[in-house]
């Protein structure tokens, strides 16, 4: 209800609430100012790093769910008299997914512990690494799961397609994967 503020909803593939905000001669009274003058960028970055960690953790959960559903499917689905998961090609893909999930979890846990240990520090590189790894991995694991499940992976009945839709936007929110790579690179002086 602020004068000069207009909000326009955007329909999205995943059904998530996304809006455009328009500010036209919008006045913010002193009582509504958040933080101290001149510290807006630092506050914004702290918020973005928190958002990145939340997205990383959320997508790690989505990836684990997709992995679990895929694993159950390849154990149950039979071809040529045995579970499809017993074939080397799928077994190796499952092994790679499991390994990457564990690596992502270790990174996520390590960054979260570091943030807890030093609350005032921004941890831009580390938060970007966790967000990049966990969101890209979630997208990869859901696509792999969908592929291994064949037509069932695409069907709404099994839920893999819904998991995939949630992963697509995660690589955009909080800064795209390319932005995360740029942030990480800059922290190494590049």
Residue ranges: model-predicted function:
Residues 149-190:
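Glycine-rich phosphate/cofactor-binding loops in nucleotide/flavin-utilizing enzymes
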Residues 58, 89-99, 129-136:
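DHp/HisKA dimerization-phosphoacceptor four-helix bundle of two-component histidine kinases
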Residues 32-48, 73-87, 147-163:
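Conserved catalytic-core motifs characterized by acidic clusters
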Residues 71, 75-82, 98-133, 146-154:
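C-terminal helix-coil-helix/basic helical segment that borders enzyme active sites and/or dimer interfaces
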Residues 1-68, 72, 82, 177-182, ...:
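FAD-binding core of flavoproteins
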Residues 86, 93, 100, 126, ...:
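Residue-level recognition of specific faces of alpha-helices
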């Amino acid at each position: 209800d602020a004068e000069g503020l207009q909000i326009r909803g955007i329909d999205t593939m995943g059904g998530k609430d996304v809006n455009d905000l328009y500010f036209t001669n919008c006045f913010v009274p002193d009582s509504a100012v958040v933080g101290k003058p001149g510290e807006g960028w630092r506050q914004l970055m702290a918020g973005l790093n928190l958002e990145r960690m939340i997205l990383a953790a959320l997508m790690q959960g989505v990836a684990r769910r997709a992995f679990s559903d895929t694993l159950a499917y390849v154990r149950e689905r039979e071809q040529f008299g045995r579970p499809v998961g017993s074939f080397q090609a799928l077994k190796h893909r499952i092994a790679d997914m499991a390994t990457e999930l564990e690596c992502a979890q270790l990174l996520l846990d390590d960054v979260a512990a570091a943030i807890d240990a030093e609350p005032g520090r921004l941890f831009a590189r580390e938060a970007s690494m966790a967000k990049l790894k966990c969101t890209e991995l979630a997208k990869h694991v859901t696509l792999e799961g969908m592929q291994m499940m064949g037509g069932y992976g695409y069907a709404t009945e099994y839920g893999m397609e819904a998991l995939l839709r949630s992963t697509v936007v995660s690589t955009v929110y909080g800064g795209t994967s390319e932005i995360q790579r740029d942030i990480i690179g800059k922290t190494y002086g590049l």
